[in-house]
Each structure stands twice: as structure tokens, then as C-alpha cells.
Amino acid sequence: MTGHSHFVSEIKLTGDSRFAFSASWDGTVRLWNVATGRTISKLIGHKRDVLSVALSSDDRQIITGSLDRDIKIWNTRSECKFTVDKNQHTDAVSVVRFYHAKKPALCVTASWDKTIKVWDNLYMTLLHTFCGHKAQVTTLDIVENSAFLASGSRDGTIMVWDIVNGKWFTKHDCDSPVNAVLFSQKLYWLVIATQTGIKVLNLPEQKFVQDELRETSLKQNESDSDKPLSCTSLAWAKNGQILYSGWSDNHIRVYEIDSSDSAQ
């Protein structure tokens, strides 16, 4: 699929996987037909790079966050229906997400201003502002069947929050800037991708199961091949037992979770 004129920052598929939305540093979001690979429409309205995009559970609403600090709500006709104009973030909006367990749904946004905000999706009224990180918030993940929200930051910490009641739950130092966080509902783990590897936090026991899974470059002729690589992205297979990870050496590494609760 081609069409964007700059980096693609995030992609979200609709529930039936027939369509995809892509956010880009070119300031637009594109709606794609997955089967044909063609652009159906473009969401135009942000003044700078679009850093994140998310879809509502019925695929009828799209939320976007941008370097221009704006949060926008769109419909499937690519019309911007609302731009948040009160209690906005004071820096780039790095992550946007929907939370569907509560009715009406909530929107969650993270920013380079070091905060996370929770909004009522019906009127985009601010409900909570989470403070605690000391640098840009780079990643969020939500457990849909609970009230847990995890955040990761360039300050090298992860925090877990109660998204409904607006309370802080726990904080852990990962000793390295955090690129991605991902809950495992099967094992009550939080998997953390950092600039130096992968950590696995057992949430009930509040201790690291895997500290720390590091990888080095597969290119033996590189002068820095013995230095730890950065893990940049994480995704679970549908069965929750296989973890896919993207790394800074252009490789995808796959890990299987064994019965003794350790990554192999």
C-alpha cells in the first residue's frame, strides 16, 4: 500500500479486518481497502504529524492525536466531528485509545507533556489527568475487561492506573526508556519493551519475571554487535502464548511462553 509521503506512525484494523486506518507524519490518516490495497479516503485536518490513531468498538468513530497537540474525533466519512478545545495537552499527543468496558466509552490520551488524560467519549469532557512520569509518555495499553491502564515513558518507568476511578496503582523503574507496554490477560503480566530489551512484570506479585531479556545484533561484522538492541514493538498471538517483538536491527523475534512462566 502506497500513498503517504512520510513515515507511517500507527495502523489500526477494523473488527472484520477488511479496512485499515494509517496515521502518518505527513499530517494525514488514510482509510484503506485491505483487499485491494487502495486508499478509500483521507482524514485531513491536523496541522502537523499524526502520531496515533484508534477505532471505537463498532468502528464508527476514529480518534487521532498529533504533534500539533490536537485530539480529533472523526466519523467513517472522514469528517472531523470534534476537536478538543478545553483542558488540552500542552505538548504533542503521542497515544490515543478507546476504553469500551465503561458505558459510554472512555477515550485515553498520552502526551509528551508527561501526562495521561481520560475523557468521556460522549462529550469529550475531561474526567482524570494522571501525573507521575517525568518525561514524555510514549505508550499505553488497556485491559478491556478490567480497569487497568499501563503507561510507559522516556523516563524509564512504567505506571499502572485505575482508569475508571482515576487512581494510581503501581510504578516500576525499568532502567531504560520505555518504547511499548503490553498486557497479557492470561498470565496477569505486563510485557515492557525498552531501549535495552524486554522486561516482564508479574502484576499480582509486583516483581519482574524476566529481567531482562536482551538481544544483540545478528550481523557479526558490526562493530557494536555485542551491544543490547532496542525493542520497539510488541504483539501477542491470538492464543496468548506467542509473543512477537520488533527490534532496532530490523528483525522480528518470536518468543514462546512456557508453563513455568518464563520466556523462551
Regions found by a protein language model. Give the residues of each.
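Conserved strand-to-loop turn within each blade of WD40 beta-propeller repeats
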Residues: 23-26, 65-68, 109-113, 152-155, ...
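WD40/WD-repeat beta-propeller blade N-cap
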Residues: 2-8, 44-50, 86-93, 131-137, ...
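Short loop/turn segments that connect beta-strands within beta-propeller blades
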Residues: 34-37, 76-79, 121-124, 163-166, ...
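Loop/turn segments within WD40 beta-propeller blades
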Residues: 12-17, 54-60, 97-104, 141-147, ...
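A structural motif specific to WD40 beta-propellers
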Residues: 38-41, 81-83, 125-128, 167-170, ...
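WD40-repeat beta-propellers
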Residues: 29-32, 71-75, 96, 116-119, ...
